[in-house]
Amino acid sequence: MDLKNKKYIKGANPYMPLWEHVPDGEPRVFTYNGETRVYVYGSHDTLRTEYCGLDQVVWSAPVSDLTDWRYDGVCFHSMDGEPLYAPDVVQKGDTFYMYAAPDRGSKVVVAKSKNPAGPFEDPVETELGFDPGILVDDDGRVYAYWGFTSAYCAELNDDMATIKPGTLREHIIPHCERGGGWWEAEEEHADKVFSFFEASSLRKIGGKYIYIYSRRQCEAVPEEGLPADSNGYLAYAYSDEPLGGWVYGGIISNNAGELIECADGTKKRAYPTGNNHGSIIEVNGQWYVFYHRMTGTDEFARQAMLDLIDVAVDGSGRVYIGRIEYNEAGEPVSSAETEMTSQGAHIGGLDSRALISAGYACCLTSETEGTTPFAESSAGAYIKPVYEGAESSPIVRIKSGTTAGFRYIDLGTESPKEIYMKLDDAVSGGRVSVRLDSADGECIAAVTTEQGKSGYTAALECEVTGKHALYFRFEHDDKTVDICGFDFFTFE
């Protein structure tokens, strides 16, 4: 297969380049110099041995195309040589305010700019705490939300930094039940429903205040395929007022991926889970959830993700966010977490004739291991973090029983005839089968690996058109050997 005229897919999921690591993303729509764009503000996982980094960067995309992301540069630098944790940015009047969290989030400062891409300057220390989320209401009043294991909120004074007297509220929603060894949670305001952990983010939709946050499930949930101490959930609550009256809504998304039923009847998730932080945004009538996922063998190389969601309010005022079911009258009746995909804003699926990096896999499992907090606690495969301009991030440590899945691929109106896979550092005797729609689906192509060979072409065994999930299943008679690294694939 001739690859020289093929280009790598851009703006898939993760939607930033695969070498970029911006977790905790807060998406905002701002108009500047006559152009309306989506701006994302997050942490910056550049230290590689701990969370976050010493600068924060801005990426933006035109509202007409959320696959076309532009690097707008560094917007804020560490003030003290310590990592900057999750920020937020809002606009009031002609000024943009960044709420940055220096010294690993131990304090919050507010800095200003006339440009949504920054730089944000003249930082002033605020009275806020960990993981600030800011809401500028329709009447111009400003509210702040923050907290780690306990949730707080308050109205801000006109200085955008200090709390208006008498407005501070504590324990505004119940938090998760217990500590995990390195943190403690008091018991009086805990429950298993709201289960607030961190990552406050506020939106106002149709007169409703929406509180988005990271939810921690301290006990294992076998029916959801999740281990104890899972905090990959983004959950939401809603209210008719900004400082109280919150009603639990449900789960918007989970960075552990799809739910899989195993042969023995147990369930597991399709992707190594870890912490989560994000929010929702409407762009040209379509709602999206922004969040992050893990790569590597720890939580220090996270990547920015987005997926489609619906948002609706029924006649009683109940808010639904995620994958919504409607009755025959078109009224919302239930919602569930949205799926985690490889396509992101490529709504029709990733172009099968382009080069598709294995780093876009949204499913990465083995036969024997269930969902793990992240890959260091297993012997399983993982997406290798890349930095400094690499166009592809490979899957490595692939052993027999590994499955890598991609939701979704556009195979076109005319079936391709063959598939090419780049499989580095291969050993002899590995078997790779390409399966349609599920890990146990119809096999449409297969190759056998050879020592020292990296490029493999296989004819398709049947005609396939349209949009499908694809799963690559790796097998070998020796269950202990690393079969290969998986770099990219393409069809022709």
Predicted segment positions?
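Carbohydrate-active catalytic/glycan-binding domains of CAZyme proteins
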Residues: 1-492
